[in-house]
Amino acid sequence: MTDCVQFRLMQADDLDRVVALEQHAFSHPWTRALYLDALTSYECWMMYLDDQHVGHGVISQIVDEAHLLNIAIAVNHQGKGLGLQLLEHLMQRASQRGCVE
């Protein structure tokens, strides 16, 4: 089976999965409350490998400048290039939104 990477915008009903991944990936993970705020203020993306949530990222935009606020890949999927794919997706989204930096 070929691995298929897909992206979609994060939704509030994703937060249980997002917070669980964060807690395994980081010693100081973002909280559910931070993600709830991020959903209304920033672009939050989910990354799937086949049908499995393997990562997520958050970007903010100020005028024409983008900032990467968070990026996470599931521990058991790290070292496979997925972080780079997620970063490239987030950079492409920022560019599509008019960001030049």
Kindly give the residue locations of the regions a language model identified.
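Acetyl-CoA-dependent GNAT
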Residues: 2, 9-80, 84-97
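Short acidic/polar active-site loop segments enriched in Thr and Asp
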Residues: 100
